[in-house]
Structures are given as structure tokens and as C-alpha cells.
């Protein structure tokens, strides 16, 4: 091959040509799944190594970009990096410029399990420490991003269900390394909870990936939630998502809207219940009035029995009853039926032959008069012949 057909470069030219070739021939943006190694902050820039166990490459997040990142990786974190290639011609050095970086799902789940275990050992996940939710709260603090579709849904649901409750909306960041900022808001609310008349706290975030919810696995944030002075309700992500914040809350709702539903009664249901209670009260009042009316009638009847006229009538009835009894038991009644009353000379009634002697004078009394007779013979009845 002739020398005039071989390209000739200086070192600088060669490196520049290689850089141009790489930058033109490679994707302007790409995703890298990797593990972070040796992250270091130098002059405001974050330097780190991305590795997968078989190969590694240097990466950098410039200070201007670093301020916009919502997540700061630590050594050993699994991450997904959005980046582009950077080639420094002076040293023929190649690295990845970080445009965005997020924790991988494995990192998020590992952190979740670590924090969950610590708080469980501290007793903060014990269901017996959960507080009951207020039945008709007057004031709720709602911590969520503003504006957001989740907030719009919550406000609409609250207005439809129980418009009497005041919602104190407190804007917070809900993604990235923002746990410290959320804790700051929680701290101020905890101090003012009594003055604000808070009945409960709602911590809400709309849908997203499980990695987006990683901030709600922060241990210090979850401890603050557990210590908050009023009941806490979480509505984070989707129904299948579970964070440590959900575990320490007094009630975990599947969505932000469900959190409002859990706290606010349905006014239509409440109205029906009120109408039913009114009907029960009317029925109770009617039955009570009926009982009182019957009791009054009974007492009036009892009083009527105590009047002199009524008492005299009762006495007359009793007297007549006794007269009838006396008439039924009177000897005259028996004498009229053909019987006679026998008495001796001393006027004593004779009820048998015992004690009667021959020549005794006896008096036989009939219903229309009496007869005196002299006993001529006494014939006692033979007891053995008595049938």
C-alpha cells in the first residue's frame, strides 16, 4: 500500500476524528443498567463508575445537571442511567455524561426490605398502634404535588362526598431525593396541628413506577409519619404498590382518591341514615305517647275507683254478696225444705241421740213455728248396721 493512500494524523487530529466518529455514529441518548461504584463529588460534579461485573465505564454528572437530578446514588446502588457519550480528544478518554439517573427496581426493593425490618423491630409496624380515623373530620391536611391530577381527583371527590370538611393542601415534591424536604413540611405541620385543628393527614402521590415511589421508603420520613400527632392516611401510586410509609400509616388506601373516600363520609348515605333516624325517633315518640296515654287512662280509672260514690258502690256490692252468703247459710232456708231444728230444754241444739234420755222435753223448730215433745223412747243406731 502506498504511503499517499494512508491517512496521516497528529495525535490531536486522530483523537478528534475518533471522537467525531463516535459521536456521529452512536445514539445521541441511551439507557444503561449498571451498578454504581465509587461515587465522588469533585468541584460540584459527580463522578462515578458504572459496572455490570464484566465491564466498567466512567460517568459524570455535571454540576449544572446534578442540581436537577431527583436521586443521588450511593456505592453499590443499582441504577438506570439516561446518558450520552463524551469523548475527550486531549486524552482520548471516553465516558458517559449522565442526563438522568434513577434507582433500579432491585435497589428500591432492597431498601424497602431493609427499612421495613428496622421499623418492625422498633414496633412501628404493629397494627395495634394504629389509630382510628375520624368519622366526620373538619380539617384535613393533604400533602401532594401541586398541580397534579391526583390532587384534582381528591378535591373533586371531597366536594362530592363531604363538602363541609376543609382541605388544607400543602405542596410537596414527591419524587427523587426529596425526603428531607417532605420531613421539613411534616415537622412544621406537626407543630401547628393543634392550632390548625387537624383531624387527619393525607400523604398522596399519583401513579408511577415503583422506583418513583422510593422516597416513601425513607426511614427517617417513615418515623416522622409514625410520630405524627393525628392519624395518617397514605394514597401512594397504584393498588399493587406498597411502600414503608404505607406500613407505618394508620390506614393505607390504594390510591389518592381512595384515601379521601376512607376519611370522608358519603353525604348521600349520611342523609339517608339521618332520615332513617328521624323516622325511628318519630316511631319512638309515637309509641311513648301511646304508652303515656294508656298509663293516664289507667290512672284515671284507678282514681275513679277511689271516689266516695264508687267506694260506697263497692261496699254495697260487698254487703249484698255477704247477704246472699248469709241467706244461703241461714237455717231458715233448710227449715223451708222440710227439716226441723231440735233443741233441749236449755236451748241447746241436739244433733244426735247421744245425751237424750227418756222423758226429756225437746223443742222441734220448723220454718213456721215450733212443737214441744216428750221423749218416750231412745233408739241409738247400731254402728255395725250402718251401710
UniProtKB/Swiss-Prot annotation:
Signal peptide: none
EC number(s) reported in the record: 3.1.11.6
Major localization listed first in the record, in broad terms: cytoplasm
Compartments reported by the entry: Cytoplasm
InterPro entries per record: Exonuc_VII_L, Exonuc_VII_lsu_C, OB-fold_nuc-bd_dom
Gene Ontology molecular-function annotations: exodeoxyribonuclease VII activity; nucleic acid binding
GO cellular component: cytoplasm; exodeoxyribonuclease VII complex
Disulfide bridge map: none
Mitochondrion recorded as keyword: no
EC top class, as a word: hydrolase
Function field: Bidirectionally degrades single-stranded DNA into large acid-insoluble oligonucleotides, which are then degraded further into small acid-soluble oligonucleotides.
Assembly: Heterooligomer composed of large and small subunits.
Protein's UniProt name: Exodeoxyribonuclease 7 large subunit
Biological source species: Parasynechococcus marenigrum (strain WH8102)
